[in-house]
Amino acid sequence: MKLYLAPLEGITSYIYRKALYQCFDGFDKYFIPFIRAKQNLNFSGREKKDISPENNSGMYAVPQILTRNADDFLRTANQLKEYGYQEVNLNLGCPSKTVVTKGCGAGFLARPEELEQFLDRIFSKTDMKISVK
């Protein structure tokens, strides 16, 4: 059995993950709370701290990406690859009203044709591992 630490925005920051890893090294993967994929490729201060390799040392950390734009997803995934990540996670589960009303997270599930095109594009254009929540 594999044990994964789920991402919870505002809870499982790098500080929480690091403390948990140091006290209980029982997780196979530590998912980082979502990063909003943007055209400008600039990570926020919180996002930079969360994805910093120094803040995730020793653990298999997986950044989560929130978007419904395939090109933004691919740009963000490529930038995360430069940080040394081998895998990213697509957030299709966030039920937050502010996320869903923008058609992201669980809101993307209401657009099956658009989602299928999105998934076809991202899986065909990157060699990174992609998991979906």
Regions flagged by a language model, labelled:
Residues L8-Q79:
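Glycine-rich, positively charged N-terminal anion/phosphate-binding segment
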Residues C23, Q79, Y83, R121-T126:
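Alpha-helical structural signal in soluble globular domains
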Residues L3-Y4, E9, Y14-I15, Q117-R121, ...:
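Alpha/beta catalytic cores of nucleotide-metabolism and tRNA/nucleoside-modifying enzymes
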Residues I51-V62, A106-V132:
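Alpha-helix-loop-beta-strand connector modules within alpha/beta enzyme cores
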Residues M1-L3, G26-D28, E54-A61, G84-V88, ...:
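Short, well-ordered coil/turn segments that N-cap beta-strands
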Residues R36-L41, L92-P112:
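Glycine-rich, proline-tolerant flexible connector loops at the mouths of alpha/beta enzymes
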Residues I32, Q86-P95:
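Non-cysteine beta-strand/loop elements that form the S-adenosyl-L-methionine
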